């Protein structure tokens, strides 16, 4: 059975998460609370919340884990062309932390194939907004003609970024935000973005799965490192427009 966590109960070891033969592989625990302290502790252990309205808070640590290594990010010819256009045209902007809650609300409202409703509830928005105020959550936003047209948000501790969700109101707007994030993280030597679960979209951009054991080991090392700055703009995209193939293989375990 999945353990129920009281306010003072610690998370069980991630190895106790439900396995692939169950109906909920990766489910580790449930609780009634989503306190900022609980949320921080979860991320530092490689755990994340995912649940719907009417459910308790469900905590997950899947095996394998989907990640994106910044140096393995795939820039297709069409995306490269888009990034060059964004760099040339002053109507396009990349803003960081300009409208964090707005990005979360837009992600909540974005239609998802095969998904009814959203897991980004008002409770989730409030909890992650608390992390944003403490400097541990960030939004990367694509703007065009003064209007926010796409973006993503996630959690950052030390040298680790945990991606949460993205949306696009116009073609490639979320990819522009992700490309800007990747370029910024590469510039500062971050080796991994947590993508939580496998999707064909992430795989097309260079995402891949690694064993949970390797993921958690990397998280423990990375979150102990000094944090990186979170001020940048669209000029970081220039680093991605010179090639279409990923860089040499990283040291992240396969």
Curated annotation (Swiss-Prot):
Entry GO MF terms: leucyl-tRNA--protein transferase activity
Signal peptide location: none
Keywords on record: Acyltransferase, Cytoplasm, Transferase
Location(s), subcellular: Cytoplasm
Catalytic activity: N-terminal L-lysyl-[protein] + L-leucyl-tRNA(Leu) = N-terminal L-leucyl-L-lysyl-[protein] + tRNA(Leu) + H(+); N-terminal L-arginyl-[protein] + L-leucyl-tRNA(Leu) = N-terminal L-leucyl-L-arginyl-[protein] + tRNA(Leu) + H(+); L-phenylalanyl-tRNA(Phe) + an N-terminal L-alpha-aminoacyl-[protein] = an N-terminal L-phenylalanyl-L-alpha-aminoacyl-[protein] + tRNA(Phe)
A GO BP entry: protein catabolic process
Main location as per UniProt: cytoplasm
E.C. numbers: 2.3.2.6
Record-linked InterPro entries: Acyl_CoA_acyltransferase, Leu/Phe-tRNA_Trfase, Leu/Phe-tRNA_Trfase_C, Leu/Phe-tRNA_Trfase_N
GO CC, alphabetical: cytoplasm
Enzyme class: transferase
Family, per entry: Belongs to the L/F-transferase family.
NCBIfam families: aat (TIGR00667)
Function: Functions in the N-end rule pathway of protein degradation where it conjugates Leu, Phe and, less efficiently, Met from aminoacyl-tRNAs to the N-termini of proteins containing an N-terminal arginine or lysine.
Designated name of the protein: Leucyl/phenylalanyl-tRNA--protein transferase
